[in-house]
A protein has these predicted regions:
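Amphipathic alpha-helical segments enriched in hydrophobic/aromatic residues interleaved with Lys/Arg
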Residues: 159-171
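A conserved active-site-flanking secondary-structure segment within enzyme catalytic domains
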Residues: 132-159, 200
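Active-site-proximal catalytic alpha-helix in oxidoreductases
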Residues: 123, 169-185
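Structural detector of well-ordered beta-strand residues that form the stable sheet scaffold
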Residues: 116-117, 138, 157, 169
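Extended, subdomain-level signal for the structured scaffold at the beginning of enzyme domains
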Residues: 1-116, 127-128, 145, 157-159, ...
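Glycine-rich, charge-decorated loop segments at or immediately adjacent to ligand/cofactor-binding or catalytic sites
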Residues: 124-132
């Protein structure tokens, strides 16, 4: 596992959003990284914020998440800041994974990012984009067989919350994205901030996957 050194500027965190994205897949990481910014100011007032978070979509039109939640993207593929951390959530991903524009942006963003991570079935988008091609990975328990069948070069892991390969991290389903994001905060900004973030969110935090 690679630990990324502290940055003098906020690390750009881009969360991909698309129609039928799972609401907690995007909301969990968003809450973790933005809460970490608030907690940094409580732990060390006046220090630089560690993260700048944006939701990125194919266009600036509102995205309708699974179950009807509407999300207004902060940027589209042409205006988004180059991410240091790319988060690809899951949901009903068939359309997003089949979209050439989405695959191209994900591949380009991942190539320049320090860490690329998927939540749940977001692993299918990473695989379709050619970012996740082989080695260990995980996804929602319900989709493990499909991920193995569609991408047989992957070593799909069961009964883990996340799989960390350094620059590439995949998590299990839905709420596991919160755990993985806390893990990423620990890697990027230190375990003290991760623990304080988990406490603020009133969520149990286990640093082991």
């Amino acid at each position: 596992m690679t630990t990324v050194s502290a940055s003098p500027r906020p690390l750009q965190v881009a969360i991909l959003v698309f129609d039928d994205v799972e609401a907690l897949d995007l909301g969990g990481p968003y809450e973790v990284f933005t809460t970490a910014c608030r907690m940094q100011q409580r732990l060390q007032p006046g220090t630089p914020t560690p993260f700048a978070v944006q939701c990125v979509a194919r266009s600036l039109q509102p995205v309708q998440a699974r179950a009807g939640l509407r999300v207004l993207p902060d940027a589209d593929f042409t205006t988004a800041a180059a991410p240091d951390v790319l988060i690809v959530p899951g949901g009903v991903v068939d359309t997003a994974a089949a979209c050439a524009e989405t695959r191209t942006w994900v591949a380009q963003a991942a190539a320049g990012a320090q860490i690329t991570a998927s939540v749940c079935t977001g692993a299918f988008i990473l695989a379709a984009a050619g970012v996740l091609t082989e080695g260990p990975a995980t996804t929602h328990w319900e989709d493990i067989a499909d991920l193995r069948a569609q991408f047989p070069a992957l070593d799909v892991q069961e009964n883990v919350r996340w799989v960390d390969r350094g620059a590439l991290v995949t998590s299990a389903g839905i709420s596991a994205g919160i755990d993985m994001s806390l893990h990423l905060v620990a890697r990027l900004a230190g375990p003290a901030l991760s623990k304080r973030t988990a406490r603020q969110m009133d969520t149990p935090w286990n640093p082991e996957p």
